[in-house]
């Protein structure tokens, strides 16, 4: 995992969509997986996976929000840590020392990596292919993690490959009422936030501030067109492998 010291940043983009209203927030220190969770890692913890595009080194996909959360809990237990999630209520205990999904603010903070531009490498998408697997270069499928350049903080595939589930419920107007310190999304909602774009995304949908949402589909298996969704884990600061 990569340690991110936390800090203040401007979340959103004045040139983006209406739900990207710029506002300054701060996040506490946390650790984030350097790579998206791979099929091999997922199988090691869960025992099997339902990815469409079989490749042990590629990110696990066809994964629901609930399945990602259950993986976080199982990974925590496997390492002797306290699970963050109550799978009856789907509430996250942010004080627990186990693995969880990043908040939307944590995800954007990590993706920006100290930058203020549309992407961590600048405002132009001309260099996106050096950092991401997207519609133009993926060959129509997700690719092995870590094969493109990392962002300035050493995180790989923050753009493209698989779109990443975040912990937050989605609300188009949330930025207008979001707290300035450690925002964790609305208390309820029908969809969860997904960030970063995927192997099937246009460049504009991979921007650091771009927001997307999806029905969390509370089931272990996603049947259909969910081979663009995956995830990576975070832990609140206090020690991580």
Question: What is the meaning of each model-derived region?
Answer:
Residues 172-178:
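A short, polar/charged loop-to-alpha-helix boundary motif
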Residues 9, 55-129, 165:
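Short, well-ordered surface patches within globular domains
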Residues 1-51, 56-76, 159-160, 167:
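A short glycine-rich, aromatic-capped structural motif
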Residues 89-94, 100, 132-159, 186-188, ...:
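Short, well-ordered junction/capping motifs at the entry into regular secondary structure
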Residues 14, 37, 48-49, 76, ...:
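Acidic glycine-/aspartate-rich tracts in secreted/extracellular proteins
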Residues 2-3, 31-36, 61-62, 100-102, ...:
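Structural recognition of the beta-strand scaffold that forms the well-ordered cores
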Residues 149-151, 184-241:
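Disulfide-stabilized, aromatic/cysteine-rich ligand-recognition loop
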């Amino acid at each position: 995992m990569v340690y991110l010291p936390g800090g203040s940043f401007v979340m959103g983009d004045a040139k983006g969509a209406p739900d990207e209203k710029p506002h300054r927030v701060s996040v506490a220190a946390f650790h984030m997986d350097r790579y998206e969770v791979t099929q091999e890692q997922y199988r090691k913890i869960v025992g099997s996976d339902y990815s469409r595009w079989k490749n042990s080194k590629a990110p696990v996909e066809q994964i629901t929000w609930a399945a990602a959360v259950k993986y976080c809990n199982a990974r925590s237990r496997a390492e002797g840590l306290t699970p963050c999630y109550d799978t009856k209520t789907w509430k996250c205990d942010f004080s627990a020392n186990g693995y969880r999904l990043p908040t939307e603010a944590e995800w954007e903070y990590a993706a920006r990596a100290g930058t203020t531009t549309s992407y961590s490498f600048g405002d132009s998408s001309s260099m996106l292919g050096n950092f991401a697997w997207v519609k133009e270069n993926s060959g129509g499928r997700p690719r092995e993690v870590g094969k493109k350049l990392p962002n300035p903080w050493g995180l790989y595939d923050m753009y493209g490959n698989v779109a990443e589930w975040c912990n937050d419920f989605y609300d188009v107007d949330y930025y207008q009422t979001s707290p300035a310190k450690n925002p964790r999304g609305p208390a309820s909602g029908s969809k969860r936030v997904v960030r970063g774009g995927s192997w099937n995304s246009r460049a504009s949908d991979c921007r650091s501030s771009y927001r997307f949402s999806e029905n969390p589909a509370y089931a272990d298996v996603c049947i259909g067109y969910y081979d663009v969704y995956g995830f990576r884990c975070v832990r609140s600061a206090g020690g991580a492998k």
